[in-house]
Amino acid sequence: YLRGTYAQLGALSATVSLVFEQSYGSLEGDSAGLAELLAVLSAISGLPLRQDLAVTGAVDQTGRVLAVGRVAEKVEGFFRVCQTLGLTGTQGVVLPKANLPHLTLRREVVEAVEEGVFHLFAVEEVDEAVELLFGRRAYWVHEKVREALEHFQKLENGEEK
Protein backbone atom coordinates (compact mmCIF):
# COMPACT_ATOMS: atom_id res chain seq x y z
CA TYR A 1 0.00 0.00 0.00
CA LEU A 2 2.73 2.49 0.95
CA ARG A 3 4.70 1.89 -2.23
CA GLY A 4 1.58 2.13 -4.39
CA THR A 5 0.42 5.33 -2.73
CA TYR A 6 3.73 7.17 -2.48
CA ALA A 7 5.92 5.60 -5.23
CA GLN A 8 5.61 8.67 -7.48
CA LEU A 9 8.28 10.20 -5.24
CA GLY A 10 10.76 7.65 -6.56
CA ALA A 11 12.45 5.22 -4.24
CA LEU A 12 11.08 5.64 -0.74
CA SER A 13 13.68 7.00 1.66
CA ALA A 14 12.19 5.16 4.56
CA THR A 15 12.07 1.48 5.27
CA VAL A 16 9.01 0.22 7.05
CA SER A 17 8.63 -3.36 8.10
CA LEU A 18 5.34 -4.64 9.39
CA VAL A 19 5.05 -8.20 10.58
CA PHE A 20 1.53 -9.55 10.64
CA GLU A 21 1.58 -12.34 13.17
CA GLN A 22 -0.96 -14.93 12.15
CA SER A 23 -1.46 -16.24 15.66
CA TYR A 24 -1.19 -14.49 18.99
CA GLY A 25 -2.84 -16.07 22.00
CA SER A 26 -6.43 -16.89 21.16
CA LEU A 27 -6.67 -14.33 18.33
CA GLU A 28 -5.51 -15.20 14.84
CA GLY A 29 -5.05 -13.35 11.58
CA ASP A 30 -3.95 -9.97 10.29
CA SER A 31 -6.67 -7.93 11.96
CA ALA A 32 -4.19 -5.29 13.15
CA GLY A 33 -3.13 -4.43 9.60
CA LEU A 34 -5.26 -1.30 9.32
CA ALA A 35 -4.24 -0.06 12.78
CA GLU A 36 -0.57 -0.66 12.02
CA LEU A 37 -0.81 1.17 8.70
CA LEU A 38 -2.44 4.17 10.41
CA ALA A 39 0.32 4.14 13.04
CA VAL A 40 2.98 4.17 10.30
CA LEU A 41 1.30 7.11 8.54
CA SER A 42 1.19 8.94 11.89
CA ALA A 43 4.85 8.21 12.60
CA ILE A 44 5.99 9.39 9.17
CA SER A 45 3.82 12.52 9.08
CA GLY A 46 4.11 13.47 12.74
CA LEU A 47 0.32 13.83 12.87
CA PRO A 48 -1.48 12.46 15.94
CA LEU A 49 -4.19 9.81 15.81
CA ARG A 50 -7.42 9.89 17.79
CA GLN A 51 -7.07 7.86 20.95
CA ASP A 52 -10.77 7.19 21.53
CA LEU A 53 -11.22 4.76 18.64
CA ALA A 54 -10.19 1.13 18.39
CA VAL A 55 -9.33 -0.17 14.93
CA THR A 56 -9.56 -3.62 13.40
CA GLY A 57 -9.27 -4.76 9.82
CA ALA A 58 -6.92 -6.27 7.29
CA VAL A 59 -5.67 -4.22 4.34
CA ASP A 60 -4.83 -5.30 0.80
CA GLN A 61 -2.22 -3.67 -1.45
CA THR A 62 -4.75 -1.33 -3.05
CA GLY A 63 -6.08 0.08 0.22
CA ARG A 64 -9.24 -1.97 0.56
CA VAL A 65 -10.15 -2.88 4.13
CA LEU A 66 -10.86 -6.59 4.40
CA ALA A 67 -13.00 -8.59 6.81
CA VAL A 68 -11.40 -10.14 9.88
CA GLY A 69 -12.48 -12.65 12.47
CA ARG A 70 -13.96 -12.27 15.94
CA VAL A 71 -15.04 -8.66 15.45
CA ALA A 72 -17.84 -8.91 18.03
CA GLU A 73 -15.31 -9.87 20.71
CA LYS A 74 -13.11 -6.93 19.77
CA VAL A 75 -15.99 -4.43 19.75
CA GLU A 76 -17.38 -5.71 23.04
CA GLY A 77 -13.93 -5.74 24.64
CA PHE A 78 -13.26 -2.12 23.72
CA PHE A 79 -16.77 -1.18 24.80
CA ARG A 80 -16.09 -2.68 28.26
CA VAL A 81 -12.85 -0.69 28.53
CA CYS A 82 -14.67 2.52 27.58
CA GLN A 83 -17.50 1.72 29.99
CA THR A 84 -14.99 1.19 32.81
CA LEU A 85 -13.18 4.45 32.05
CA GLY A 86 -16.44 6.30 31.39
CA LEU A 87 -18.28 6.63 28.10
CA THR A 88 -17.65 10.04 26.55
CA GLY A 89 -19.89 9.81 23.51
CA THR A 90 -16.95 9.91 21.10
CA GLN A 91 -15.55 6.41 21.57
CA GLY A 92 -16.06 3.61 19.12
CA VAL A 93 -14.57 1.03 16.80
CA VAL A 94 -13.46 1.30 13.19
CA LEU A 95 -14.13 -2.04 11.51
CA PRO A 96 -14.41 -3.53 8.02
CA LYS A 97 -17.77 -2.90 6.37
CA ALA A 98 -17.63 -6.49 5.12
CA ASN A 99 -18.02 -7.66 8.74
CA LEU A 100 -21.34 -5.85 9.31
CA PRO A 101 -23.76 -8.43 7.87
CA HIS A 102 -22.63 -11.06 10.38
CA LEU A 103 -21.96 -8.82 13.38
CA THR A 104 -23.98 -9.80 16.44
CA LEU A 105 -23.38 -7.73 19.57
CA ARG A 106 -24.62 -7.91 23.14
CA ARG A 107 -27.72 -5.85 23.84
CA GLU A 108 -25.92 -3.26 26.00
CA VAL A 109 -23.50 -2.46 23.15
CA VAL A 110 -26.35 -2.19 20.64
CA GLU A 111 -28.21 0.15 23.02
CA ALA A 112 -25.11 2.32 23.51
CA VAL A 113 -24.76 2.62 19.72
CA GLU A 114 -28.45 3.43 19.32
CA GLU A 115 -28.17 6.08 22.06
CA GLY A 116 -25.12 7.62 20.37
CA VAL A 117 -22.75 7.08 23.29
CA PHE A 118 -20.65 4.47 21.44
CA HIS A 119 -20.01 4.29 17.71
CA LEU A 120 -19.27 1.75 15.01
CA PHE A 121 -17.55 3.09 11.90
CA ALA A 122 -17.67 0.59 9.03
CA VAL A 123 -15.08 1.32 6.34
CA GLU A 124 -14.25 -0.16 2.94
CA GLU A 125 -11.11 1.84 2.12
CA VAL A 126 -8.03 2.95 4.04
CA ASP A 127 -8.82 6.61 3.27
CA GLU A 128 -12.09 6.37 5.21
CA ALA A 129 -10.17 5.23 8.28
CA VAL A 130 -7.52 7.90 7.70
CA GLU A 131 -10.20 10.61 7.85
CA LEU A 132 -11.74 9.16 11.02
CA LEU A 133 -8.47 8.69 12.90
CA PHE A 134 -6.67 11.86 11.80
CA GLY A 135 -9.74 14.10 11.74
CA ARG A 136 -8.63 15.52 8.38
CA ARG A 137 -9.37 14.83 4.72
CA ALA A 138 -7.32 11.89 3.46
CA TYR A 139 -5.68 13.89 0.66
CA TRP A 140 -4.32 16.34 3.27
CA VAL A 141 -2.87 13.56 5.41
CA HIS A 142 -1.31 11.94 2.33
CA GLU A 143 0.23 15.28 1.40
CA LYS A 144 1.84 15.54 4.86
CA VAL A 145 3.22 12.01 4.48
CA ARG A 146 4.59 12.90 1.02
CA GLU A 147 6.23 16.04 2.42
CA ALA A 148 7.89 14.02 5.17
CA LEU A 149 9.09 11.37 2.70
CA GLU A 150 10.48 14.09 0.41
CA HIS A 151 12.31 15.56 3.41
CA PHE A 152 13.74 12.11 4.27
CA GLN A 153 14.87 11.77 0.65
CA LYS A 154 16.64 15.14 0.72
CA LEU A 155 18.35 14.23 3.99
CA GLU A 156 19.47 10.94 2.48
CA ASN A 157 20.84 12.74 -0.60
CA GLY A 158 22.66 15.31 1.55
CA GLU A 159 20.50 18.15 0.24
CA GLU A 160 19.28 19.15 3.70
CA LYS A 161 20.69 18.98 7.18
Model-derived features: where do they sit?
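Peripheral, non-AAA+ core regions of ATP-driven protein-machinery
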Residues: Y1-K161
